[in-house]
A protein has these predicted regions:
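A short, well-ordered alpha-helix in the C-terminal region of glycosyltransferases
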Residues: 143-157
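A donor-sugar binding/catalytic signature common to diverse glycosyltransferases
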Residues: 69-110
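Nucleotide-sugar donor-binding patch of glycosyltransferase catalytic domains
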Residues: 100-128
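C-terminal "capping" alpha-helix adjacent to the active site of nucleotide-linked donor transferases
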Residues: 118-119, 126-142
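C-terminal alpha-helical cap of glycosyltransferases
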Residues: 156-182
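Donor-nucleotide binding loops and adjacent catalytic segments primarily
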Residues: 1-78, 109
């Protein structure tokens, strides 16, 4: 519903920057009717700080770990996350607009670069860019639709099963067992 935008901010156990600051930057672009769900993962300190700052704001829902995360991602107009492989792949498989923020150096920055280069996500390199990119995606549903279409072109919806099949086959090979045909 364009009148009630939903943004999900997933911090993860390793954090995704200063969550209270990120919340402060996202809330103004949501307006009075928008909603922000913040998932802090196992980062108890981030949850405590966010609760102190925003626990009484009806536009903000604060969560620790959420299992499964899929329903929250599917309900989001925009997902703000680091570019960890699991959450990013899950979001792209579902088809959710993504803004990457504060990726951890190494594989997450490589993931962010790949997602940005292939138009699968927007990468907010600064806090100001975070605000601008979330606002832009919320104002322009056609940009979200274009991003989701690119995600569906790149991401195999059956990738989880294929990965599991590879792992089973390789494990069986290491154990000297034959893998039954699927």
């Amino acid at each position: 519903d364009p009148a009630r935008p939903e943004v999900v901010l997933v911090g993860g156990s390793m954090g995704a920057g200063n969550l209270p600051e990120m919340i402060a930057r996202i809330l103004p672009v949501l307006g009075e009717n928008g909603h922000l769900t913040v998932v802090c993962g196992s980062n108890v300190d981030a949850l405590r700080r966010a609760t102190e700052a925003y626990g009484s704001d009806p536009r903000v829902s604060l969560r620790a770990q959420v299992t499964p995360l899929t329903p929250l991602i599917a309900a989001a107009d925009v997902l703000v996350t680091k570019s960890g492989g699991l959450t990013s792949t899950e979001a792209m498989t579902i088809g959710t607009a993504i803004v990457v923020s504060h990726p951890i150096a190494g594989c997450e920055t490589e993931n962010a670069r790949y997602m940005e280069d292939n138009e699968l996500a927007l990468w907010a390199h600064t806090d100001d860019e975070l605000t601008a990119k979330v606002a832009d995606l919320l104002r322009h549903p056609e940009k979200r639709a274009e991003m989701i279409a690119k995600q569906h072109e790149k991401i195999d919806p059956d990738c989880a099963r294929k990965i599991a099949d590879i792992l089973i086959r390789r494990t069986n090979e290491m154990m000297g067992r034959k893998t039954p045909d699927a």
